[in-house]
Amino acid sequence: MNNCNENEALKTNSDGNNVMLIRRVLQQATDHYPRLSALGFTLQYANCHSCDNEQQGNAQLLRFYAEAYCRIGEYSKIRIEAGKPSQPTLLRWLWEAESTSTCRMMMLFNLGVCSHPRHDSSAMDGIQEVMSLLVAAWCEVEPNGELTEIKVHRVERTNPAAFDKRYAELRDAALQIASPVAFAR
């Protein structure tokens, strides 16, 4: 798990490079994690003051990422203390760089942080926990904001029969993010 304060600079690409950026980020994530999970969702701002000022909007997104890292890190520690494995993860983020009152986003992470086949009856239970952590993180940053339209994607190299189909679904969902696309990890 990365340190809560550790953030790489936000990176944005021009329209012509968005597809390459998305494919590169997805490929790196699937190469890095045999059991990749991704959550696609929409952040809704309560006040449009955040969306009018690009610098303030970026700062708010960075606060959201930091809050999400911290909450997922704490969740991981609790799992380990309970005797359940929780593998380290690097959160990768894709989002619409020019958003208004909403921002479509995707978070990619190691499914092993919230689920282990030998210790958990369902991977979806762990994913639900991560989703609730994201909702809580956004509410901390934007108190009356909402996190909506959550879509779960699981791409597991450990299941080769379904891998190509699931990867294509994830790629298609990521390509739906409006241009220009930005990313962070």
Language model features: what each stretch is:
Residues 51-52, 103, 162-163:
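Short, solvent-exposed polar/charged micro-motifs at secondary-structure junctions
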Residues 53-56, 106-108, 120:
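Surface-exposed beta-strand edges and their flanking turn/coil or helix-capping segments
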Residues 88-115:
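Histidine-centered divalent-metal-coordination microenvironment in nucleic-acid enzymes
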Residues 1-33, 111-185:
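Catalytic "initiation/cleavage/transfer" segments centered on a nucleophilic residue
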Residues 26-97:
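Signature for HUH/AEP ssDNA processing cores
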